[in-house]
């Protein structure tokens, strides 16, 4: 652990605390929900949505690191985070996180839509009050976290339409099922780190990796089926349907290769990168379809 005084924290240290790259995923999926709802063009509302979701995601990231700074200090992957590295004081991280979360809720409620604020509140509480503590005691922590991570499209959809219709809930399902193989691949790769801090997640408990791989495959298959529902329900054209089918089958193939014991470690990395490629491709196709192709 670094001995750098937290009182010397720089702006870059606080920015790192908000995990801007990871927070961008929440912002982008909220934008997908907003654009897929096809509301009347309102650049001010769109900018406020981005600002509100950015603040919420950054605040949650800061508070999560405040809650987990003890375990972060004992894992190689997280030991360099601002709090365990001594760059930011725990009290400062707490204050920053609380202010960002409260500010985001106020902004979204007053200037965007109350339902968007409600889904943001659900995101904050499900992540910090359910997922973060569950990592210490539950094998199902990944799935609990996937619930929290699937709310941003609903934030965007409710901001655009004032309610959530069928396609919005499909987006929730897509984000949920996508996260399971994504984080299973990460957790399998870093299972020794998680074992060192006694997180009882499936990749720690399943030494062979057979159940990890099977569970990843099941959720990837569920993702493929869920992603095709908009086409089956007449909510998109074949442009999106083909994109969802091709990318979904490619993702599924990587999950199948993860089932092979001899190459499981290498396959986990490939599954991770496949998940990174899958999401922007399928969500980008959905936005293009909804904005320009659906009558």
Swiss-Prot record:
Gene3D superfamilies: UbiA prenyltransferase. Pfam families: UbiA. It is a multi-pass membrane protein. Its EC number is 2.5.1.141. PROSITE patterns: UBIA. The chain crosses the membrane at residues 43-63, 92-112, 114-134, 140-160, 166-186, 231-251, 272-292. Keywords: Cell inner membrane, Cell membrane, Heme biosynthesis, Membrane, Transferase, Transmembrane, Transmembrane helix. GO terms for molecular function: protoheme IX farnesyltransferase activity. The keyword Isomerase does not apply. It is an enzyme of class 2 (transferase). Pathway: Porphyrin-containing compound metabolism; heme O biosynthesis; heme O from protoheme: step 1/1. GO terms for cellular component: plasma membrane. Carbon 2 of the heme B porphyrin ring is defined according to the Fischer nomenclature. Converts heme B (protoheme IX) to heme O by substitution of the vinyl group on carbon 2 of heme B porphyrin ring with a hydroxyethyl farnesyl side group. This is Protoheme IX farnesyltransferase. It comes from Opitutus terrae (strain DSM 11246 / JCM 15787 / PB90-1).
């Amino acid at each position: 652990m670094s001995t750098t005084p937290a009182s010397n924290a720089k702006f870059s240290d606080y920015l790192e605390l908000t995990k801007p790259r990871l927070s961008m995923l929440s912002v982008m999926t909220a934008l997908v929900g907003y654009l897929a709802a096809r509301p009347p063009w309102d650049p001010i509302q769109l900018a406020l949505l981005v600002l509100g979701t950015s603040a919420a995601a950054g605040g949650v990231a800061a508070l999560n690191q405040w809650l987990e700074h003890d375990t972060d200090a004992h894992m190689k992957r997280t030991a360099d985070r601002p709090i365990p590295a001594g760059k930011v004081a725990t009290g400062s991280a707490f204050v920053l996180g609380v202010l960002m979360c409260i500010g985001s809720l106020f902004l979204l409620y007053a200037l965007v839509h109350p339902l968007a604020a409600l889904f943001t509140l659900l995101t904050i509480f499900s992540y910090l009050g359910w997922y973060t503590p569950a990592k210490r005691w539950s094998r199902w922590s990944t799935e609990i976290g996937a619930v929290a991570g699937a709310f941003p499209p609903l934030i965007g959809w409710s901001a655009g339409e004032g309610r959530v219709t069928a396609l919005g809930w499909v987006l929730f399902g897509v984000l949920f099922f996508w996260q399971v193989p994504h984080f299973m691949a990460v957790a399998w790769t870093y299972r020794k780190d998680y074992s060192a801090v006694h997180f009882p997640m499936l990749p720690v408990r399943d030494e062979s990796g057979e159940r990890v791989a099977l569970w990843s495959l099941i959720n990837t298959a569920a993702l493929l089926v869920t992603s095709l529902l908009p086409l089956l329900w007449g909510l998109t054209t074949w442009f999106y349907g083909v994109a969802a089918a091709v990318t979904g089958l490619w993702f599924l193939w990587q999950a199948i290769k993860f089932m092979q014991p001899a190459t499981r470690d290498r396959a986990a990395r490939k599954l991770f990168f496949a998940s990174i490629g899958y999401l922007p491709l399928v969500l980008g196709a959905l936005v293009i379809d909804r904005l320009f192709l659906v009558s």
